[in-house]
Amino acid sequence: ANKKNLDKKFFIISKNLSIYEKDFLNKINLRFVVLCENLYISQINTAGIPDHKKRTLILDINFNEKYFERVIHHEVFHIIHNNFENIFNEEIWSDFNDKTFEYAECSTCSDRLGLDLYNKTNGFLTEYSKSIASEDMAEVFSFLMTDKIKMKNIASKDSILFNKIEFIKNGIKKIKNF
């Protein structure tokens, strides 16, 4: 790995993980962060993989710089979700959506991969949010952690996202008080 890139990404990861209290990271069972390059899952280049059994977050330091900070929180949410599926219930989450909407069967069997924020949200922040419920939750969480003001503005105009944001915030509060 290029030392300059590694140092830069290490700084970004440290800065973003320092937002979380140590006690919270213990509660969600995150112990290790592994940095790698050119990470793939099912032939798709991916930004990160949460390994729940090993309590590890694997992050690709070469992943698109534009999304890198958000990716850290997105993957942290997968660790949270895996340890607190009862708090972040996917059926309750899915009920927030328009009744005509259906998620894909799995995130890797969907071509909904875009990570850019929609101009018109209609209940979803990104194309990737539309893949499966857990990815939708992770996208909402990642934007909440990196741009609270933008999320507040979006929530004021999008009632579906308002409900999703409140659901995530309340779930995180439950874990902190756990």
Range-by-range predicted roles:
Residues 1-4, 151-153:
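Charged, low-complexity surface segments at secondary-structure and domain boundaries
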Residues 28-178:
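Active-site-flanking segments in enzyme catalytic domains
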